[in-house]
């Protein structure tokens, strides 16, 4: 899988999402639950805004000194016996991982959940050279079996219910039991455990890399990443170049923010800090590789969008977004969905494929308020819109003409007065009662799904004149 998950046009993807009543119900329920849990966890911590400010400060400091911390990380990983590779492009990253697999003559690879490995199409690259790649995260495993893309950053199978999952397991894996979650989880556990033991290579992502120790931090709810890191003889960790922290002290702050913002917990079930195996350690990989991926991030770092790199992938913005609530994750056409996806995806994938995403927002600002590291997401969405209009001339000719006419009318008192007088008569063939009828010309996309009030026959100026102090009415 790559970052792009659909070839459909944006409007078609949105239409599919709106028509999927189960998905919208599941997303609404999950958003409400995660939002409530996040507020409770934040309240328990106390002075949440101060923690957010500290998180923002840490992320900004790290990005401002990213070259220093990346070199420090590389030196310390190398000192501990690991190998570090800096990949400028996603193709370079995938090729390096292919080369490691070829060198090890690997046939089976097991991996934990990782957005950046999907971004670089790692699974496809390994399958090209004959490797079987197994997802060990339960949600990702379900989607892999069903050949379905993720719809949420931390809950990839959010759009499926247990009956659908049971049917997938029955059709693809021969599962014969009920749709009870416990039974299905037990079935998957047996499937995965057997393959864990046979895998030659384990691949993980990286929530944070600690510069001064050469360590990686992984945060999971299932413990699958621990097995990926400890059973296979070779481990490959893949990280976006921005996922750095200077020391364990900063890591402590960001993990606390991540867990509370993502799922409303003080800590997830498993927080693991590890790296290349040391002489005194009894388990872990014999060989360790760290792949640091740029893939456009250095360009973002030097642009007006650099604040998006503060993201810690908690999905708090996704869990409060009203647009995501109604259209779901697949509508974004990218592995990165929600407000963070609408900002990040056009930067990584370009405006040609993703120029609609910055407009998939009501600009309500809920995402900015929810972000634990204070990324001004709605401001960045507006910046995208500005760039698109200036560079791409996105607006259709009819829209440009309509806006030009409105600008002329709104800036002239005489024209505005004349227009307000003519509007009721001009719209009368299209009105029913006090509302505009459905399917009216260029207003169709609005009037088909929302009530559009008909122009009032009484102008405000006339009403005010009659009702001002001393008036008769």
UniProtKB/Swiss-Prot annotation:
[4Fe-4S] cluster 2 binds at residues 321, 364, 367. One of its GO terms (biological process) is lactate metabolic process. One of its GO terms (molecular function) is metal ion binding. Gene3D superfamilies: Alpha-helical ferredoxin (1.10.1060.10), NagB/RpiA/CoA transferase-like (3.40.50.10420). Keywords: 4Fe-4S, Electron transport, Iron, Iron-sulfur, Metal-binding, Repeat, Transport. InterPro entries: 4Fe4S_Fe-S-bd, 4Fe4S_Fe_S_CS, FTHF_cligase-like_sf, Helical_ferredxn, LUD_dom, LutB, LutB/LldF, LutB_C. It comes from the Bacteria. It holds the Pfam family Fer4_8. The keyword Transferase does not apply. [4Fe-4S] cluster 1 binds at residues 311, 314, 317, 371. Residues 302-332, 351-380 form the 4Fe-4S ferredoxin-type domain. Belongs to the LutB/YkgF family. HAMAP family: LutB. This is Lactate utilization protein B. It comes from Bacillus cereus (strain AH820). The lineage of its organism: Bacteria, Bacillati, Bacillota, Bacilli, Bacillales.
